[in-house]
């Protein structure tokens, strides 16, 4: 859900700490920097369908799906 902008950093830091401790999380986010840093797998969902799934390095450096390429070009 949307967070108070003043709380986003604090919540993301807590989630990073939990991930470092080995907690498994399923996170839906537009915070791509966070996903790149914390995730072991990243999925791109478009129109209710999984369009791409990869390790963060592959996902961000070599996206295959045209919609994902477009999305990343606009936000990174």
Language model features by range: what are they?
Residues 1-3:
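ABC ATPase nucleotide-binding domain "signature" loop
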Residues 29-30:
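H-loop/switch region of ABC-family ATPase nucleotide-binding domains
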Residues 53-54:
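ABC ATPase "signature
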Residues 9-21:
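Helical segment within the ABC ATPase nucleotide-binding domain
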Residues 5-7:
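Helix N-cap at the start of a conserved alpha-helix in ABC-type nucleotide-binding domains
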Residues 57-61:
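Short acidic-hydrophobic catalytic motif
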Residues 35-37:
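A short, surface-exposed alpha-helical micro-motif characterized by mixed small hydrophobic
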């Amino acid at each position: 859900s949307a967070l108070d902008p003043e709380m986003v950093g604090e919540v993301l830091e807590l989630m990073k700490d939990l991930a470092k401790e080995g907690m498994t999380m399923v996170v839906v986010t537009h915070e791509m920097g966070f996903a790149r840093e914390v995730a072991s797998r990243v999925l791109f969902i478009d129109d209710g369908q999984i369009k791409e799934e990869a390790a963060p390095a592959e996902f961000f450096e070599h996206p295959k799906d045209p919609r994902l390429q477009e999305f990343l070009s606009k936000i990174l």
